[in-house]
A protein has these predicted regions:
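Ser/Thr/Asn(+Pro)-rich, low-complexity disordered segments
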Residues: 275-276
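Short, conserved phosphate-binding/catalytic loop or strand-edge motifs used
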Residues: 286-292
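Aromatic-lined substrate-binding rim segments of carbohydrate-active enzymes
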Residues: 293-318
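N-terminal accessory segment at the very beginning of proteins
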Residues: 1-250, 256-258, 263-265, 269-271, ...
Length: 324
């Protein structure tokens, strides 16, 4: 729904729409809604209209949320002023949006677990900072307050020796030997999914936590609040889907190196495993088995009979894995 339609209905900054809490200010719309149990999905855009994309999330059953919009009063410069604060509760998760648009998330015990980093002075730096780019979208920087003692785990597979990611900056992009999965768990009792496919960066600083997307039309993240990692992962899987069971061969012993140059070299290794009576599920011939880049056939100068090779491996109970 657009800003214009909201303005026709009410002058309030907040609106309860079906099972969601919505805030609008200037051209920005913020929408918070339940997405599975004990979780809240937060979206925002400066364009005045949110997309209908679910991205990595499944369209699962939404829990019934409790939404409250409260009027509050303060005296400033001798004048009584009215403002609104809104709340949405889904199981363990409670989000508050204050008069300045700052979002704070609490657990079921009322403990603060995540808070946007809004800086009103001196530059009025927003927590949700959208900067127009040349692609017709925005470069987005999302900033949160940081607990220096918090421990953070996850985010996929990186070539770093750190289990606790506190103090790390991670590139959110896939590379050879790097698989970026923008989901982390905190020892403060929550899981967080950055639900955007854009290339970007995540920084888990001691003074601030930041997520950056190089090009996007909106902000989108999911926060799951639970007491144990098991509960967090269970809700996370309900939200994004469950991985199928791997085939049996994939759970066996793999042999790989960088790389096998010829068919004879690979088969000599496979036959030696058989001679030693070591079960071999997969042997990976790896890259550059092809004649030219982009032509991913076997190079017959070095791999003269791939069919015969594959059949012999199959008789051994071994699969020939190759890249790509």
């Amino acid at each position: 729904m657009s800003i214009a339609k909201y303005n026709e209905v009410t002058m309030s900054l907040f609106k309860k729409e079906e099972n969601a809490l919505i805030r609008f200010f200037n051209s920005e719309i913020v929408k918070i809604e339940p997405w599975g149990k004990n979780s809240l999905r937060v979206r925002a855009t400066p364009d005045g209209r949110l997309s209908s994309k679910n991205r990595a999330l499944l369209d699962i059953n939404k829990e019934k949320a409790e939404i409250t919009i409260e009027k509050k009063y303060e005296v400033k410069d001798g004048e009584k002023r009215e403002h609104e604060t809104a709340y949405i509760v889904n199981g363990n998760a409670k989000a508050e949006i204050d008069k300045n648009g700052k979002i704070t998330v609490y657990n079921q015990r009322g403990e603060k677990i995540l808070e946007e980093a809004l800086r009103l002075q001196p530059l009025k730096t927003p927590a949700r900072f959208f900067k127009a780019n040349l692609l017709g979208n925005y470069q987005l920087t999302m900033s949160f307050e940081s607990d220096p003692d918090e421990r953070v785990f996850g985010m996929g597979q990186y070539q770093y020796p750190y289990l606790n990611l506190k103090g790390c900056t991670l590139e959110m992009a896939h590379r050879n030997s790097q698989a970026s999965v923008p989901f982390f768990m905190s020892d403060k009792g929550y899981g967080f999914l950055w639900n955007l496919p854009a290339i970007g960066e995540a920084t888990f600083g001691k003074n601030v936590t930041k997520f950056k997307a190089e090009s996007t039309s909106e902000l989108d993240y999911l926060i799951i609040v639970a007491d144990t990692p098991k509960e967090i992962i269970e809700t996370y899987m309900e939200a994004i889907g469950r991985s199928p069971m791997m085939p049996e061969y994939a759970m066996g012993f793999w042999q790989s190196k960088l790389r096998y140059r010829t068919q004879d070299e690979l088969m000599a290794v496979a036959r030696k495993y058989r001679e030693l009576k070591i079960p071999l599920s997969v042997i990976v011939c790896d890259f550059f088995h092809w004649p030219h880049q982009g032509d991913f056939r076997f190079d017959y100068d070095y791999w003269p009979n791939p069919k015969e090779m594959t059949e012999e491996l199959k008789e051994m109970g071994t699969i020939n894995g190759k890249q790509p």
